[in-house]
């Protein structure tokens, strides 16, 4: 059999874990001065990037807005991971939007059936 002390210790650990999981505690990783330094670095990076973009735009000159550049014209986006497109609803939302969803599904499915 398991001793009462072991059960008591396990119960206390379980309660402590449950309380810790429910509380939202803030534990500072950085000091205030470190955070200020990090923000300053980020600000400097942003200024550098905007300066570089401005210099490049001055070098290239104005583009014809009607004609897209060749690079953008031939650009193809390839997905590296499968993408799930969809919406999740709970039962209350499903009841609320049932008529609209049925209408949308019938619009999509009827042309598919007519093509066959």
Curated annotation (Swiss-Prot):
<comment type="similarity">
    <text>Belongs to the motilin family.</text>
</comment>
<keyword id="KW-0165">Cleavage on pair of basic residues</keyword>
<comment type="function">
    <text>Plays an important role in the regulation of interdigestive gastrointestinal motility and indirectly causes rhythmic contraction of duodenal and colonic smooth muscle.</text>
</comment>
<feature type="region of interest" description="Disordered">
    <location>
        <begin position="39"/>
        <end position="74"/>
    </location>
</feature>
<dbReference type="GO" id="GO:0031788">
    <property type="term" value="F:motilin receptor binding"/>
</dbReference>
<dbReference type="Pfam" id="PF04644">
    <property type="entry name" value="Motilin_ghrelin"/>
</dbReference>
<feature type="signal peptide">
    <location>
        <begin position="1"/>
        <end position="25"/>
    </location>
</feature>
<dbReference type="InterPro" id="IPR015662">
    <property type="entry name" value="Promotilin"/>
</dbReference>
<dbReference type="InterPro" id="IPR006738">
    <property type="entry name" value="Motilin_ghrelin"/>
</dbReference>
<protein>
    <recommendedName>
        <fullName>Promotilin</fullName>
    </recommendedName>
</protein>
<dbReference type="Pfam" id="PF04643">
    <property type="entry name" value="Motilin_assoc"/>
</dbReference>
<keyword id="KW-0964">Secreted</keyword>
<keyword id="KW-0732">Signal</keyword>
<dbReference type="GO" id="GO:0005179">
    <property type="term" value="F:hormone activity"/>
</dbReference>
<dbReference type="InterPro" id="IPR006737">
    <property type="entry name" value="Motilin_assoc"/>
</dbReference>
<dbReference type="GO" id="GO:0005576">
    <property type="term" value="C:extracellular region"/>
</dbReference>
<keyword id="KW-0372">Hormone</keyword>
């Amino acid at each position: 059999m398991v001793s009462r002390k072991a059960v008591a210790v396990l119960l206390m650990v379980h309660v402590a874990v449950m309380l810790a999981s429910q509380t939202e505690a803030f534990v500072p990783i950085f000091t205030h001065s470190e955070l200020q330094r990090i923000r300053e670095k980020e600000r400097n990076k942003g200024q550098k990037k905007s300066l570089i973009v401005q210099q490049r735009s001055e070098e290239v000159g104005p583009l014809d807005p009607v004609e897209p550049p060749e690079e953008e014209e031939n650009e193809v986006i390839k997905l590296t991971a499968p993408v799930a497109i969809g919406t999740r609803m709970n039962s209350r939302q499903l009841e609320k939007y049932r008529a609209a969803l049925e209408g949308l599904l019938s619009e999509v499915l009827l042309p598919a059936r007519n093509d066959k």
